Amino acid sequence: MKARIDAIIQRNQAEYLEQLIPQTDLLLREMEEYGGEHGVPSADREVALFCEITARAANATRCLEIGMAIGYTSLHLARAVGEDGLVVTIDPSDEMIKAAEGYLTRAGLRERVRIERGKRWTLFRSSKILLI
């Protein structure tokens, strides 16, 4: 669970919930450690898993992610959309994009993710997007 417990749940509740979450694979664990060591803003394991489960439940074949960082949530979403699906993700940082491409390639999911370099509003200036 998170390093600090939210005010919503107590420590023993958090520990119980932690036991319900499947063990993460080695690549995801490496990404978590890298993110922690380098101060990379990233979703918690619980949040990324929630995104994956939600995408699967919705039978989503296309997902949009804004702010990819090292690709932690992108990887979860790419698993969810399946072989013919696509995750479009946006990040302004060349450093983060390079790291994410490496992790996604190692996971065998790079072809499911289209990475756009830029800031969210400049990429969608002409689009009429209502909800992301």
Give names to the regions the model predicted.
Residues G36-E37, P41, R45-I132:
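S-adenosylmethionine/decaboxylated-SAM
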Residues M1-Q23:
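N-terminal auxiliary segments of SAM/dcSAM-dependent transferases
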Residues Q13, L27, V47-F50:
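Short N-terminal amphipathic alpha-helix/helix-capping patch enriched in small hydrophobics
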